[in-house]
């Protein structure tokens, strides 16, 4: 109460506080603090993932998506740093979120991760790169955490393949995950594509 002869006192305004008895004035919440209620004796530190850059604030401001801030009581947007490659964040993040299996991100400050391309995989969280399927393996879908072995009677002879190829006429194999097929032996023949056996003459 800042006037004499009064019959009551005034509540501190939102964004302000009074922390002593008999006060004639209210004080604004300082940088890095805020409150949104009247009649308060203190202010609240900005939460992790947020900041308050004005005095007398009734709100805290979330860090932008793609950034994070692990500290309480921050008073500037510069306290929000870019999330590292291999991670992402939404608004108001206190920590980066790692890219999940099947996804990756090779740039910092991002709001999401990319699916692994077909013919590729990502088998760890927080990855900054995707890996092509190796010889004898393939996949034809995005966002995968692994590749599939080629079926018996088929092969994959290139890295990053989205398809498997059937063994041609005169060739065969009876194992999965192969990068080539075997010519039929003398005295045998193979007259179908994708064969897992050879036939004696």
Report the location of each language-model feature.
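Disulfide-rich, cysteine-dense extracellular ectodomains and adjacent flexible linkers of secreted
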Residues: 1-201
């Amino acid at each position: 109460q800042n006037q004499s002869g009064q019959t009551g006192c005034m509540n501190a305004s939102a964004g302000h506080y009074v922390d002593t008895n008999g006060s004639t004035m209210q004080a604004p919440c300082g940088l890095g603090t805020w409150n949104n209620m009247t009649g308060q004796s203190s202010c609240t530190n900005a939460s992790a993932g947020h900041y308050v850059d004005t005095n007398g604030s009734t709100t805290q401001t979330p860090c932008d998506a793609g950034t994070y801030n692990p500290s309480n009581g921050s008073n500037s947007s510069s306290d929000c740093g870019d999330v590292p490659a291999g991670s992402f964040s939404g608004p108001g993040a206190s920590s980066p979120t790692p890219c999940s299996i099947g996804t990756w991100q090779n740039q910092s400050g991002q709001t999401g991760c990319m699916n692994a391309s077909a013919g590729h995989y990502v088998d760890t969280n927080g990855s900054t790169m995707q890996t092509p399927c190796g010889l004898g393996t393939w996949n034809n879908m995005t966002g995968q955490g692994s590749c599939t072995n080629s079926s018996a009677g088929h092969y994959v002879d290139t890295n990053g393949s989205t398809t498997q190829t059937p063994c041609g006429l005169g060739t065969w194999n009876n194992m999965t995950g192969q990068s080539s097929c075997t010519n039929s032996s003398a005295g045998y023949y193979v007259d179908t594509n994708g064969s897992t056996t050879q036939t004696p003459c």
